[in-house]
Amino acid sequence: MNQELTNNPFNPVAPLKTFDEIKVSLASPERILSWSFGEIKKPETINYRTFKPERDGLFCARIFGPIKDYECLCGKYKRMKYRGVVCEKCGVEVTLQKVRRERMGHIELASPVAHIWFLKSLPSRIGLMLDMTLRDLERVLYFENYVVIEPGLTELTYGQMMTEEEYMDAQDIYGMDAFTANIGAEAIREMLAAIDLEAEADQLRADLKEATGELKPKKIIKRLKVVESFLESGNRPEWMVLTVIPVIPPELRPLVPLDGGRFATSDLNDLYRRVINRNNRLKRLIELRAPDIIVRNEKRMLQESVDALFDNGRRGRVITGANKRPLKSLSDMLKGKQGRFRQNLLGKRVDFSGRSVIVTGPELKLHQCGLPKKMALELFKPFIYSRLEAKGLSSTVKQAKKLVEKERPEVWDILDEVIREHPVMLNRAPTLHRLGIQAFEPVLIEGKAIQLHPLVCSAFNADFDGDQMAVHVPLSLEAQLEARVLMMSTNNVLSPANGAPIIVPSQDMILGLYYTTLEREGMKGEGMVFGSVEEVQHALDAGMVHLHSKITARITQIDENGLEVMKRFDTTPGRIRLGALLPLNAKAPFDLVNRLLRKKEVQQIIDTVYRYCGQKESVIFCDQIMTMGFREAFKAGISFGKDDMLIPDTKWPIVGETRELVKDFEQQYMDGLITQGEKYNKVVDAWSKCNDKVTDAMMGSISASRKDADGSEMEPNSVYMMAHSGARGSVTQMKQLGGMRGLMAKPNGDIIETPIISNFKEGLTVLEYFNSTHGARKGLSDTALKTANSGYLTRRLVDVAQDCIVRMRDCGTESSITAVAAVNDGEVVSSLSERILGRVLAEDVVRPGTDEVLAAAGTLIDERMSDTIEEAGVASARIRSPLTCEAEEGVCAMCYGRDLARGTMVNTGEAVGIIAAQSIGEPGTQLTMRTFHIGGVAQGGQQSFLEASHSGKVVFDNAQTLENDAGEIMVMGRNMKLIIQDDNGEERASHKVGYGTKLFVTEGQKVARGDKLFEWDPYTLPIIAEKSGTAKFVDLVSGIAIKDETDDATGMTQKIVIDWRSATKGNELKPEIILVDADGEPVRNDAGNPVTYPMSVDAVLSIEDQAEVKAGDVVARIPREGAKTKDITGGLPRVAELFEARRPKDHAIIAEIDGYVRYGKDYKNKRRIAIESSEDPDHKVEYMVPKGKHIPVAEGDFVQKGDYIMDGNPAPHDILAIMGVEALADYMIDEVQDVYRLQGVKINDKHIEVIVRQMLQKWEIQESGDTTLLKGEHVDKQEFDQANAKALSKNGRPAKGEPILLGITKASLQTRSFISAASFQETTRVLTEASVQGKKDKLVGLKENVIVGRLIPAGTGGATMKVRRVAQDRDNVVIEARREEAEAAAALAAPVADDMVGGDVFDQPVHHEEESRD
């Protein structure tokens, strides 16, 4: 059992035991004793004089092993030759000191103790097993109440609680032996031991069939789950109460001598000491037959000390040490960021690494980095030693060490040899995505700073203001190979988030390229003609022609057939020099660079070169344009002075106009024509417009081309060049320097009405300066907080998606999703071609109106195909998606499509889940780190009208309009759309037209681009009369339902609807306005219903009681929320909210069926709305809506499945339940993308789909049928299918269930792997659950494998594991055959006495043999 770990003195490493799964379960007392090497009887640790461990104490050498290698405690046996001898004097076995890390001890408890995890971790497992409440349990355990265990023939019941007095009385009444009642953990243990699990389970199932109501079945199901898990796992319930406590090995709770004779010790020793002390005292008290009350108190204290050892602070007071600091218990060792899981198992420190400051290395190639000689010498020491020895320069390691320390010249030569083609990895913290670690070839440099290639800065998000980076050396050949092939910076040109190049010039380089490609009128040498590129260069060098002159030149190009041809171009010398760097390729013509290059264009050029000319060419090209960009920027000498910021002359007139406008608004407000909110909104709008005008004027004057004396065009303004090229700065920043600073936001996001009119060049007034501090300070504090939030979001995403790996080529699924262009407010934000690029088609795409197949099903769409499809005017395509993939584990390659970072089909073994999590999480951090550059300047201004974005013919969809007195057309419909069609009838734009919108166009009218289509009031939502008549107020009682609000400033009064439910008699009221005709009869609408307008809270009435109302008049207005500034601050929590699948506070109510709206009888403070199905009038679905909420549908309206009955954000769960998976996916993708798009961040849809797939893994059981699944349980789709297949094979009823959406935190905690869940959050709860259920971890995901110390089953790790498994199987066959031979031989030989055979030959199961080396 406890054999020595090392079998061979010369091979101290025992053969590795391979395993396929890890099971965790409760330990029985026998199991604990089998681990133990002896009982610990004394609380002493070591003798303070001799520093030797005390015998039978917490560090006892006899139990745990020797302190020095191969030496017993008293020193009688020393050295290897006595290996395995047990010293008869001190009882210590002579062996390695290392065994003190693995040998355990135990403590025999004088009285049983409940394990706090199973007692207090909710739901309490002991409580569920015994069907007792936690309070009752604690009363029994902490000796306050007795519990009846065996009622006998008395009137008592099993599990009844009794106080001490009641117990005495009962004994008097029934006699001493008539019943059994007990107190403390013994009682609980007896009750648990008495449970017959199978009978209990049958009983519970029977109860469940009869149970009615809401809570009862839930409770029974909870108990049944626990009982079942005990049955399946083979655990016994009484093991939740401990009689023996294991003691962990002493080296894991060390006692370290400090200088000065003091000791530092682990808290665990303190906690163990407490337990031993109390246990020994209890033993003694029992021997002395002490009074009950004393013994009980001691037992209670023992229970408390064991609780503290397992989980300090979970119950009662926290036990503190000498310095008032809480002691770290066993649970605390595992929990949290500093616990075992996250600190030591998931993140380890590594050797062969160093760190230093980084500086730029513009003369490096893309695959190189500069490594300081000193660092290289230290990092590559072992390699240098071995080379020195191989070359015969040193005979021993010691000599080699001396040589290296003296830094002899031959050492440097050898260092050069060693680092040749030995890549090193550079890493910059925070590593937000996989491009944060890349491999480079080191180049030795003088100095102490690492040199980094400028082009990889954007991938590392590095700058040279003092950033540090770490260097790591891959040692083994395999590691070097992987670093070279997979991690080399030249292999990471494209970003995994969106497939765009990430190795892109920035700042100086962009400025240089922009300057090079400028074209100016009237420069020297304009109109010259050149025969070749060389001639141009010659003329430039001779100074005959300017870099920016307009010239004509002949340039070599490649035509379609791959032949070289000469073509003439009108261009400039600068562009020709740039064109000379382009690789010769038909797909990369000179036209690519024959234009003014801004950052976007440069990125596009690199993308084109990478796609069509291959990786090698594009890397060389990048290096060349980097060098050129730097050189030209330096030659151009572009700089920035205060006179480069031009303040437009028209600034003050524009500001004056706006001031007049604002005065008007103030006046209107004083006259009571508009409310304060409207005035605020109008003022804010006026100033935003003014700001835009000033900015336009400034940009106009800065970007205007100027001529000098001799008529040649001057260089553009240098600040304009910087911003326009995309090198640095933005229009917003220029506006603040030379226009006006604009409106500022308060910390809560409201906009301050008074803008900052000055700019930084003029200088701010004191008041303006004070106003601008708000935003600036908020920006800084946000940055700090959001970084943490974003990091946490990434961590949750990684955790939920970590086991999503490409496991197969094709899962063969039939289902797919529809891709359409994403349209936002009538403008296409991402085209169909962007959405289908790199995806696999599920169905053929045909040219509209014909049968011509543009792309067949099953093809991977590349750039050419997507362009073809886009040009053909295809509206939508069906594509494969990770959401619909049917692979058992992970996803299949066909459903995923292209690996964005490589531009080819994704490989099996790619960890797409982690890539998705990083792609979504990384920009979150980026954006939050970048909020403050604009300094809190408000970006806002509401749009109140819409102009045609295309010309064409107007078509209405679901039209419902009404003409009012003034002859204006008002929209009365809820889901009306305005569509603009081109001449072929193709839809060019579509806009949702909201209720109350004023239309300027009619059906069939032709509009030109820029025509005004319709306008609306962005600040209030009107309620419009549909018929004429007299208004009559119902229940609008002054003081209860409406209040007259008098504005102090204007003296005008308005009637505002207030929350009437809070008033004493308010609940009966139904405030509304109805229309009556001259006879006082209600006016009826077309459907024959009376025209009523229920009022919602905060509505402002626009008419008086008994007023005449014409059709189309506004009856009341409901204010909309004011304009808030939008930035990722609102965005990051929004993304988290979406992925956590939280229900929004006032969530929209979605219609579940098609049908007609009917208002039902009202409740106290809820309104009842029913939808009567259009197919089956008896089928109704009811909804409750809080009174006072505005309901956008009226009695008798027809609604379609999926329409909103109440406005707000929909809850994603509802979308899933009503509209299905695809609608949910569309919603999630659009919402998440909207947040990122606002920041200009591109993320591919498939990443979001992968995360949503992980959120949809579980099914909720509706009916259990004849399966073992229970109603309300969440199970994996696989388990669900398996259980149903099992039931059907026995001709039983299958279970019914439906997919549910879990938030990412919930989903990570419910993964199959308990190791992964435990390392994520709520460690104790996860482990408690796992051990009760006897869970097995199959080690499928990445985290589990990292934790148990294996290669991850992705990438090369996945392949290695396959090979290993095959080898293992082969070995097993051979070993079996050998064993059978040996057994046969043994049987032939004479029978030998048993004790002659050594006990350790057959001890290890045979299949644990080391893998074969062939």
Curated annotation (Swiss-Prot):
Pfam family, one: RNA_pol_Rpb1_4
Catalyses which reaction(s): RNA(n) + a ribonucleoside 5'-triphosphate = RNA(n+1) + diphosphate
UniProt keywords, alphabetically: DNA-directed RNA polymerase, Magnesium, Metal-binding, Nucleotidyltransferase, Transcription, Transferase, Zinc
Keyword Protein transport: no
Positions contributing to Mg(2+) binding: 463, 465, 467
SMART domains cross-referenced by the UniProt entry: RPOLA_N
Subunit structure, interactors included: The RNAP catalytic core consists of 2 alpha, 1 beta, 1 beta' and 1 omega subunit. When a sigma factor is associated with the core the holoenzyme is formed, which can initiate transcription.
Annotated protein name in UniProt: DNA-directed RNA polymerase subunit beta'
Name of the gene: rpoC
